Curated annotation (Swiss-Prot):
It catalyses: [(1->4)-N-acetyl-beta-D-glucosaminyl](n) + UDP-N-acetyl-alpha-D-glucosamine = [(1->4)-N-acetyl-beta-D-glucosaminyl](n+1) + UDP + H(+). Polymerizes chitin, a structural polymer of the cell wall and septum, by transferring the sugar moiety of UDP-GlcNAc to the non-reducing end of the growing chitin polymer. One of its GO terms (cellular component) is plasma membrane. Transmembrane segments: none annotated. Belongs to the chitin synthase family. The gene is CHS1. The keyword Calcium does not apply. It comes from Schizophyllum commune (Split gill fungus). GO terms for biological process: cell wall organization; chitin biosynthetic process. Its EC number is 2.4.1.16. This is Chitin synthase 1. Its main location: membrane. One of its GO terms (molecular function) is chitin synthase activity. It is an enzyme of class 2 (transferase).
Length: 189
């Protein structure tokens, strides 16, 4: 759940940054309405129960509602939609509007079966893409924490040049307090 919170909190901070861009023709105070966060989880039996609790605390999931069979037909996925103003920090503290959290439109897709990452990407593009019709899509793995302005800069690359078909951000290892994580050769590399 810490990895999920790190990623989600980073995304929510990025949405707040977009809303602070008050001189922008695209973003500004109502910029959150132009962003939809889609979480696709691979397998109802596989998802970490603590991560599911964090998602429930943010208002995106209700425990006990999901069934694996409805009307004698197997269920493929469970979809929850909600607009929240709550974030859970990587240190598991709940923050809301009083800390600058903007509303965030969320879709949580909990797939019934574990069918791996590529299938999750297909779910996003094939199931949600035609409905949302996004101009830009940013895919993040759980544990990746975008910097506070990262999503804006990725979006800007597409906005400036309509010929751009893909972009990749810089990945930086978290060094930890006083750089202690650098003692781990995998992090230091």
């Amino acid at each position: 759940e810490e990895l999920f919170c790190r990623t989600m909190h980073g995304v929510i901070k990025n949405i707040a940054h977009l809303c602070k861009r008050d001189r922008s023709k695209t973003w500004g105070k109502e910029g959150w309405k132009k962003v939809v966060v889609c979480i696709v989880s691979d397998g109802r039996q596989k998802i970490n129960s603590r991560t599911l609790s964090v998602i429930a605390a943010m208002g995106r999931h209700q425990d006990g509602i999901a069934k694996n069979v409805v009307n004698k037909k197997p269920v493929t996925a469970h979809i929850y939609e909600y607009t929240t103003q709550i974030t859970v920090t990587p240190s598991m503290k709940i923050e809301g509007a009083e800390r600058g959290t903007m509303p965030v439109q969320l879709i949580f897709c909990l797939k019934e079966k574990n069918q791996k990452k590529i299938n999750s990407h297909r779910w996003f593009f094939n199931a949600f893409g035609p409905i949302l019709q996004p101009n830009v899509c940013v895919l993040l793995d759980v544990g990746t924490m975008p910097g506070p302005t990262s999503i804006y800069h990725l979006w800007k690359a597409f906005d400036i040049n309509s010929n751009v078909g893909g972009a990749c951000g810089e990945i930086v290892a978290l060094k930890g307090k006083w750089g202690l994580n650098l003692l781990n050769p995998l992090v230091a590399a």
